[in-house]
Amino acid sequence: MRHFKYTKDEAEEAIDQIVHDEKHRAILRRRYHDKALLEPLAEEFGIEPRTVSDIIAKYRADLEGFIKWRRNHQESFY
């Protein structure tokens, strides 16, 4: 599986548009912006690393899908 490439701005916009839970939003921002690892994130937010992994997995496809959609439709706006 290839790693999906995105900019920090793309990740920020996708997170803001898709994720409504503030705690999940904060975790995803730290993960996608700072490339934070699971254990430090779990410690920072007082949850288990498995829970952090589940949160990331829950939103990954939606975030990547939003970024791809945005890229495809950005051209039509200009």
Language-model segments: what does each one mean?
Residues 19-34:
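Short amphipathic alpha helix immediately N-terminal
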Residues 70-78:
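Short acidic DE-rich linear segments
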Residues 40-45:
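Short alpha-helical "recognition helix" segments of helix-turn-helix
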Residues 60-71:
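C-terminal flanking helix
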Residues 3-23:
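Short, Lys/Arg-enriched anionic-surface-contact patches
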